[in-house]
Curated annotation (Swiss-Prot):
Functional description taken from the UniProt entry: May have an important role in regulating the access of circulating IGFs to the tissues.
Cystines in this chain: 41-47, 45-60, 539-581, 541-603, 565-570
Pfam families: LRR_8, LRRNT
A molecular function (GO) term: insulin-like growth factor binding
Protein name in UniProt: Insulin-like growth factor-binding protein complex acid labile subunit
Glycosylation sites recorded in the entry for this protein: 64, 85, 96, 368, 515, 578, 586
Alphabetical list of InterPro entries matching this protein: Cys-rich_flank_reg_C, Dev_Immune_Receptor, Leu-rich_rpt, Leu-rich_rpt_typical-subtyp, LRR_dom_sf, LRRNT
Organism: Rattus norvegicus (Rat)
Signal sequence residues: 1-23
Ranges where the LRRNT domain occurs: 32-74
Length: 603
């Protein structure tokens, strides 16, 4: 569909430009011909003749034309008139262009099309009329384009469509009516479009869909009704769409979905009901959707989830329920979702998750529970989620991690616990996470780490502990992290680092110690980036090795790093990495790298 996937129009656009490769471009000068012995190219246009296909394309885009060129060659196959100031298309304007199969009139300030404007275009395949000022279209306008496969009328001012407007377009495949001002559609407006595969009605003002509206559209694959003013989804509206695969109902005003509203839609793979006002889901809301893979219900007003609500969705792979008002997850909430891979429940009001809430989710790989207020999670609440590899619990009011909170997550790769209030983590509570690669504990209230906290995490590569209240860090704690690559312990209260703290971490390449209370530090070999700023460094003899290391490796310990900037108005941002001396007094305020060699002469 043009709106969601780029659509045939974009494919054609690219195809024509690719075709220019072997073409001989002419016509940039008035009177230039498209071929040495061929027809003349219109003044102010550019012509391209493909020697391989023997097809002629005429480009008259953005020439500020107020009327159509008079001398368009009759052999033209593609005509680009977009971006002009045409106002209207008179009758029989293209009557001599019987070979034309592509016509682009988008963005040309068209206010009207005469009923016979398309006369003679019996071979036209693609017609672009989007981004104009059209308010109405005469019945019979398209009777002259029986071969039309793609018609785009999006972003006009259409307030109504007459019955019979699309009569005779039996080959139409793609129809885009999005971003107009349509309020009501005639019952039979789409009759005769038996081959239609993609229909866009997004961005209109539709408040109601009558049951007969989609009769005869048995081949339809995608239907976009997003960004309208629909208030409910009635039964039997979509019953005539047995082959529909994608249905977009997002960003409407829907408060209720009738029982069996989607009955018979066995081919449906994608259903988007996000950004509405749906308050509740019933057990009979989704019966019959045996082929559904994606269900999006985020940004609604759902307050609770009843058991067995999703029982018929055996092949569902993605379920989005974020940004609702769900308060509790009870047992068997997700029963029947054995193929589910992605479950998002972020930014609800969940305060309680009962053991058994996630039972049956044998294949779930990503779970997002962030933005709730769980405070604590019952032990073994994630039991049985053997294939879960990413668990998001950010900003969830967690204060404590119990011994068996994460029991059963043997395949977990990424655990996100940042922006909580975690002040304690029980010893070995992470021991079962043998496949963990990334652990994010940023912005919590940790003052110390249990000695065996990371026992069993031999595969961990990324450990983020910044913005806590750590005062000490023992070598025994980090010892098991043999594969640690990225270590961030910035913004803590560390005053000293234990001897040999990082010696066992031979793979560490990124180390951030900024914003602590460190006075000394011995550099580690193998580092690729070291952040040391905002510490009260004692620039006496013990820091000479760090000075030499920093001077010899400016790429590892840069004075500043410029953030990559994009856009014309983007201002570069610099992150500084100062090693500012707090003492002795004679070098106080200097950067360690600027302290002279004579200062260390007696070391």
């Amino acid at each position: 569909m043009a709106l969601r996937t780029g659509g045939p129009a974009l494919v054609v656009l690219l195809a024509f430009w690719v075709a220019l490769g072997p073409c001989h471009l002419q016509g940039t000068d008035p009177g230039a011909s498209a071929d040495a012995e061929g027809p003349q190219c219109p003044v102010a246009c550019t012509c391209s003749h493909d020697d391989y296909t023997d097809e002629l394309s005429v480009f008259c885009s953005s020439k500020n034309l107020t009327h159509l060129p008079d001398d368009i060659p009759v052999s033209t196959r593609a005509l680009w008139l977009d971006g002009n100031n045409l106002s209207s298309i008179p009758s029989a304007a293209f009557q001599n262009l019987s070979s034309l199969d592509f016509l682009n009139l988008q963005g040309s300030w068209l206010r009207s099309l005469e009923p016979q404007a398309l006369l003679g275009l019996q071979n036209l395949y693609y017609l672009h009329l989007e981004r104009n000022r059209l308010r109405n279209l005469a019945v019979g306008l398209f009777t002259h384009t029986p071969s039309l496969a793609s018609l785009s009328l999006s972003s006009n001012l259409l307030g109504r469509l007459e019955e019979g407007l699309f009569q005779g377009l039996s080959h139409l495949w793609d129809l885009n009516l999005g971003w107009n001002s349509l309020v009501v559609l005639p019952d039979t407006v789409f009759q005769g479009l038996g081959n239609l595969h993609e229909l866009v009605l997004a961005g209109n003002k539709l408040t109601y869909l009558q049951p007969a509206l989609f009769c005869g559209l048995g081949e339809l694959r995608e239907l976009d009704l997003s960004r309208n003013a629909l208030r409910s989804v009635k039964a039997n509206v979509f019953v005539h769409l047995p082959r529909l695969q994608k249905l977009y109902l997002d960003r409407n005003l829907i408060t209720a979905v009738a029982p069996g509203a989607f009955l018979g839609m066995k081919a449906l793979r994608w259903l988007d009901l996000s950004h509405n006002r749906v308050a509740g889901l019933m057990e009979d809301t989704f019966p019959g959707l045996l082929g559904l893979h994606v269900l999006r219900l985020a940004h609604n007003a759902i307050a609770s989830l009843r058991p067995r609500t999703f029982k018929d969705l055996h092949f569902l792979e993605e379920l989005q329920l974020g940004h609702n008002r769900i308060r509790q997850l009870g047992e068997r909430t997700f029963e029947g979702l054995g193929q589910l891979e992605v479950l998002t429940l972020n930014d609800n009001q969940i305060t309680e998750v009962r053991v058994g809430a996630f039972s049956g989710l044998f294949n779930v790989a990503v779970m997002n529970l962030s933005g709730n207020c769980l405070r604590s999670l019952p032990e073994r609440v994630f039991q049985g989620l053997d294939k879960l590899h990413s668990l998001h619990l950010e900003h969830s009011c967690l204060g404590h991690v119990r011994l068996h909170t994460f029991a059963g997550l043997s395949g977990l790769r990424r655990l996100f616990l940042r922006d909580n209030s975690i002040s304690s983590i029980e010893e070995q509570s992470l021991a079962g996470l043998s496949e963990l690669l990334e652990l994010d504990l940023t912005t919590n209230r940790l003052t110390h780490l249990p000695r065996q906290l990371f026992q069993g995490l031999g595969h961990l590569e990324y450990l983020l502990l910044s913005y806590n209240q750590l005062t000490t860090l023992s070598a025994e704690v980090l010892g098991p992290l043999q594969r640690a690559f990225w270590l961030d312990i910035s913004h803590n209260h560390l005053e000293t680092l234990a001897e040999g703290l990082f010696s066992s971490l031979g793979r560490v390449r990124y180390l951030s110690l900024r914003n602590n209370s460190l006075q000394t530090f011995s550099p580690q070999p193998g580092l690729e980036r070291l952040w040391l700023d905002a510490n009260p460094w004692d620039c006496s003899c013990p820091l000479k090795a760090l000075r030499d290391f920093a001077l010899q490796n400016p790429g590892v310990v840069p004075r500043f790093v410029q953030t990559v900037c994009e856009g014309d108005d983007c201002q570069p941002v610099y992150t500084y990495n100062n090693i500012t001396c707090a003492g002795p007094a004679n070098v106080s305020g200097l950067d360690l790298r600027d302290v002279s060699e004579t200062h260390f002469v007696h070391c």
